[in-house]
Amino acid sequence: MEIITHPYSWITLARLAILILTAFLAWMTYQSNLLLKRFQPDFNLLLSPLETIVRVILVGVCLLLAWLTGLPAAQLGLSMVNPLSSIGLGLAVGIVIQVVVNLLTLEAINFFGRHIYSTQVIRNILPGRPLEWLLVPLALLPAVAMEELLFRTLWLGAFRDIIPLPLLIIGTSLIFGLMHLPQGSLGVVIAAGVNILLSLLFLWTGGILVPLVAHYTVNLLQVIVAHFQRDWLEEY
C-alpha cells in the first residue's frame, strides 16, 4: 500500500497511461487511414454518435490522468488567468495560422502535385445540411479538447520535468503529425508544424486556453474555407 500511495508512483502510473493512450490513438489513426483508402463512408464521421461519445470519454480520461499526476494546475496549463483576453488571442492566432496553412497547402499542391494531400477527411466532415452547420462546430469541440489536453496538458505538462522541452516538442509534433496521416503526407507535415506553434503558445501563455481556442479556430475555418472550395474538392 505504501508504494501505491507514494506521489512518485502515481505520476509514474499517469505517465505510463499517457503513453498507452497515445499509442492507442496512433493505432486508431493508422487503422482509419487504411479504412479510408478502401471505403468512403456516406455519412459524416464527425457527427457519428459513437465517435462523439468516444471523444467525450477521452476528454474525461485526459482530465483524470491530469489529476492523477498530482502536478499543480498551473504546470498542466489548467489554471485560468484572463480568460477573455486568452480567447481573443487564441482567435487571432488561429485566424493567422489558418490563412498561412491554406496558402502553404495550395502552393505545396501546385509545386509537388496532388498526390501529397488527401481531401477525403475534409470532404467527409463538410456540413451537407443547414442543421449540420450547428452540429459540426459542436462536434469539433471534444475533438479539439481531447487533442489539446493530450498534447499540451499531459505531454508538455507531465513530461517536461524528465524530457528536455525542445525534444518533447519535436517528439509530440511528430506524433501529432502522424495522427493526421489520413490527410496525406502534406497533412502530416502541416499538422506537425501547427503542433509546434501550439506548444510554444502553451509554454508562452502558461495555459491551455489560448492554444485550445487557436486550434479550434483553425479547424472551424478549415471547414468554412472547404465549403467555398467544394467544387475544387470534388474534382480533386
Segments (PLM) and residue ranges:
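Membrane-interface starts of transmembrane alpha-helices
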Residues: 42-57, 131-135, 160, 164-172, ...
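Membrane-interface helix/loop boundary segments of multi-pass membrane proteins
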Residues: 106-125, 146-171, 200-207
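Alpha-helical transmembrane segments of multipass membrane proteins
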Residues: 22-26, 58, 62, 93, ...
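Functionally important transmembrane alpha-helices
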Residues: 24-31, 166-179, 184-236
